[in-house]
Structures are given as C-alpha cells and as structure tokens.
Amino acid sequence: MMNVSLKLSFLVFILVIMSNLGSEARELAGVNEIFEIAARSSNNAGTARALQQAPPCKRDVDCSFECPKGGFCNDRLGTCDCF
C-alpha cells in the first residue's frame, strides 16, 4: 500500500512540474500575449469567436452579450458585428 501512495505522490509531482514548464514556454514564446490581445479586442468579433467558439448568431438579439455597445448579426457569416 505504501508503494502505491509513493507512486501517486510522484505522479502528482511530475504533473505539476510539467504544467509549470508548459506555462513558462508559452510566456517565452509570447503565445499568451497573442491570445490576450485577441480576447480583449472588441472590434474584431471573428477572432474572439474563434478563440471562445461562440455559437453563430441568427438574430440581432444574439449579439447583445458579445457587443456591450450594441451590434447586429451578419446573417451570411453568422457573426456579430459590433458598433
């Protein structure tokens, strides 16, 4: 039984180390910065939709949550165009 608990604690330790290394690699490569800029951009609804995978709009009311200042639904593309 002691052997199992030792393996489990070692596995948790390895997982924590690996997740920290992945986070540092993303910071060094600048990937986090690209995602933050795209998520903050309210003028580019297409990029934010690609990152968050929001369902396509069908009516102007569907864009009320994506566009705090208002917007309209582009029926052809299924995206919200914000004002």
Swiss-Prot record:
Disulfide bonds join C57-C73, C63-C80, C67-C82. One of its GO terms (biological process) is killing of cells of another organism. GO terms for cellular component: extracellular region. Residues 1-25 form the signal peptide. Its main location: secreted. It comes from the Eukaryota. It is found in: Secreted. Keywords: Antimicrobial, Disulfide bond, Fungicide, Plant defense, Secreted, Signal. Belongs to the DEFL family. This is Putative defensin-like protein 257. It comes from Arabidopsis thaliana (Mouse-ear cress).
